[in-house]
């Protein structure tokens, strides 16, 4: 049995590309209780907490947990609370390069645990006020770290990426695939 510690439709869609049969169960953790560390350490601690929270309920299962955040100039950009916060985020990212970090935590059915942080650099085009307003009118910023999804209207903001495209969507499937298949270390 394979468990994805998420109800994210994007993560489910991506995981189906490498694991056709799995169950999705959200992790119940208090993210605010975890100390905010540097971005890579923080996403790894969130992924670890999510995965570990499901171990008691699924002791013999392979559990996959992930957490993705956007960071700009060392500051974490989570999911915007409202349109105004989304506007601030998108405006700040215009013409700049930021990082997308995903912490992966995998507990195999044999009990071994693997962890990794994947980083992707994303550069936005310079954005006018009209560009930002046009993007926000699509409501595509909702429920997205950094207020954009590269798989939808957010793609029009992106000038280039350096790294794993699927990491920006929330699940770096190439890395995850290798974590699932690798020999125990």
From Swiss-Prot:
InterPro entries: ITPase-like_fam, Maf-like. Keywords: Cytoplasm, Hydrolase, Nucleotide metabolism. One of its GO terms (cellular component) is cytoplasm. GO terms for molecular function: dTTP diphosphatase activity; UTP diphosphatase activity. The active site is at 67 (proton acceptor). One of its GO terms (biological process) is nucleotide metabolic process. It catalyses: dTTP + H2O = dTMP + diphosphate + H(+); UTP + H2O = UMP + diphosphate + H(+). It is found in: Cytoplasm. It is an enzyme of class 3 (hydrolase). Its main location: cytoplasm. The record marks 10, 68, 151 as: Important for substrate specificity. Its cofactor is a divalent metal cation. Its EC number is 3.6.1.9. Belongs to the Maf family. YhdE subfamily. Nucleoside triphosphate pyrophosphatase that hydrolyzes dTTP and UTP. May have a dual role in cell division arrest and in preventing the incorporation of modified nucleotides into cellular nucleic acids. This is dTTP/UTP pyrophosphatase.
